């Protein structure tokens, strides 16, 4: 794969040889070199066919090999750095606090976590939002530049204001995590995380340091958001924050809610929806559907074993269950499984190369304080290190949160196959919590944007589900205005079964 290419989410798809590679990575430090070799040609061809093998495996920096940046936070002016022709169009960057920084993780040998922070274009009392991109191992800069960040990237690599950036209604943080993702790095491979305990503890430590650095935001409402594999990260972090607050471990974090977009949260239920969704969208035949039902029985059984015991059986669960997805994709040549309306043209279904080129420019790296570190958009080593986490059910962490009044929004674009709305709606419906019966009997109502139907909404108490029309896996990219209205209404407690006609800009 060429240096400019990468793939955004790398969910679900690999062969048995790819699974066995996880053991070699974790037991062989030589794997943490600038390239990753696979013993099986078939595995490599499969992975490349789905754009799952980034060129750069992970940012593991040998000790003493470069003058790695120390823990810093600095104010940045992206528009000036990019030499943007239209820098004068829109608000002045100087009006807001735009920051980039590193956080030295305390429970690691040498890990540094990179982040961006953008103060609200509206007012500093707006909620604080953290965004987590999935993968696992994909940089949150993907969302920042192509979905809901303050800026978009032009063809000439200049930047321009995003009219529907989430910083219009929130003070927003984008974190490169787990360690080894994006500009985050370590000099010791043992810092690479392999489960949600490690990931959520690192993020909790980061948030403690963030609020210590920015005390004026401590009392603001706080929301956790993200998409795709962040369907694992988000419940784990919400649970960790809630637990830390209860135990008075540090600075109280004013957690009000968490939102999962087209996420992977309960694999056992969601894999069962693949065949039904594919049939509904005419991707497969009735006979294909019947065959997939049998495959799902095996998937369901082994996923239950994974949830009970973890370990190697979870590797096997990924192999067994992803065969369902692979069989569907094989039926439609060139299918973009993140948006089934579109063709996956060329080597990538989406071209996000502008971001990699921009962030690897010398003047940009200098402005961000990242030294000579090469930007890694999606890390195959981080992805592989989390392999035994994939089939774990993170829904189990949610009932105690919503029962305590912490709001949950699950939203999904209707044309995404890989984390489809049907599978997400099923685990939400089946979740055992105090309001399950009330949610089950709640009516669906239209979600309106500018007076037009933009989705279908269901709500009861702290739980909301939203099916977003005319969107795929990345809702803020496909429906930027609707996603901004969704966020604002939800944070204000207005994303309810009573239609909301508009939002304030």
UniProtKB/Swiss-Prot annotation:
Source organism, top-level taxon: Eukaryota
EC number(s) reported in the record: 3.4.16.-
GO CC, alphabetical: extracellular region
UniProt cross-references to InterPro entries, sorted A to Z: AB_hydrolase_fold (IPR029058), Peptidase_S10 (IPR001563), Ser_caboxypep_his_AS (IPR033124), Ser_caboxypep_ser_AS (IPR018202)
Positions bearing carbohydrate: 37, 86, 122, 301, 432, 444
Active site per database record: 228, 416, 473
Disulfide bonds: 138-378, 306-321, 344-349
Tissue specificity annotation: Expressed in roots, flowers and siliques.
Keywords per UniProt: Carboxypeptidase, Disulfide bond, Glycoprotein, Hydrolase, Protease, Secreted, Signal
Secretion signal, residue range per the UniProt entry: 1-22
Compartments in which it is found: Secreted
A GO BP annotation: proteolysis
Gene Ontology terms for molecular function: serine-type carboxypeptidase activity
Family annotation (Gene3D superfamilies): alpha/beta hydrolase
General function of this protein: Probable carboxypeptidase.
Family per record: Belongs to the peptidase S10 family.
Listed name of the protein: Serine carboxypeptidase-like 47
